[in-house]
Amino acid sequence: MKQFENKVAVITGAASGFGKAFAAYGATLGMKLVLADIQQDALDATVSELKSRGTEVIGVRTDVSLAREVQTLADITMSTFGTVNLLFNNAGVGAGGFVWENTEKDWEWVLGVNLNSVIHGVRIFTPLMLDAAARDAAYEAHIVNTASMSGLVNAPTMGVYNVSKHAVVSLSETLYHDLGLVTDQVHCSVLCPYFVPTGFNQSRRNRPASLANAQTPTRSQQVAQAMSDKAVTSARISADEIAQQTYQAMREGDFYIYSHPEAMDPVKQRFEQLLARCNPGDPFAGHPELRRNLARTVRG
């Protein structure tokens, strides 16, 4: 996709972090925006901010883990703008700790937001895009699914999150191949960011009460949260920079989008180990002190 002016973008997780940055940058390109988020006050504030700049934008409170609410999001988009050109499946949450200590509710919450939301978005919006492409040879569309570097490597104490993001990478790669069989007008990308100061580490603020854990967090869960807090808050690349990279990747037709190319060594190491049938290597190999500190801390 080369031109973005007057195109319609649907963005989930749009009230903060990457989603808000996608919206803000899209607004500078003259796009029409449909913003979805579960946090109503933050969503309203983002919509108001963009409207004050002259952007044509609406907000739709959406629990993206629920198919019926994503369907409502699509219905409102079509009734308001009549089309959709960009879909950012971006909403995401996290829960850490040893995989045997994660509860059923941890899995339900993280997979619901991180994976099921992408499934719902692809299943509901892709047919709308393909139908528009069949009716108009000039129509263009693009889907961006936000995964993570955790969709390419498996760090300890991040099992639930790792599983969800590996699944998003797999879904996105399959979507790429499937679209290639039927159209030249609808494309997709997968964004694999490293740590970025987005407030993602505080995603538990939007965890539904029905999926809250009754028990006190375990030591490994507390350590994982502390590591996430430190990594996110100390990150140097901003969400705004990632948004610009993402739009540029769409212009160039890139599928894989990496926020930190210098962090790809563990990915290369992992695939070399797979090919050599080696046991999994240390994802912290470049920073051995991290593994030592983690082991010492979780053991108490």
Residue ranges and their predicted role:
Residues 181-260:
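SDR active-site lid
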Residues 29-45:
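Conserved glycine-rich Rossmann-like NAD(P)H-binding loop of the short-chain dehydrogenase/reductase
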Residues 148:
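Residue(s) in the substrate-gating loop at a strand-loop-helix junction
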Residues 40-41, 60-72, 104:
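The beta1-alpha1 cofactor-binding region of Rossmann-like NAD(H)/NADP(H)-dependent oxidoreductases
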Residues 2-34:
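Canonical Rossmann dinucleotide-binding motif of NAD(H)/NADP(H)-dependent dehydrogenases/reductases
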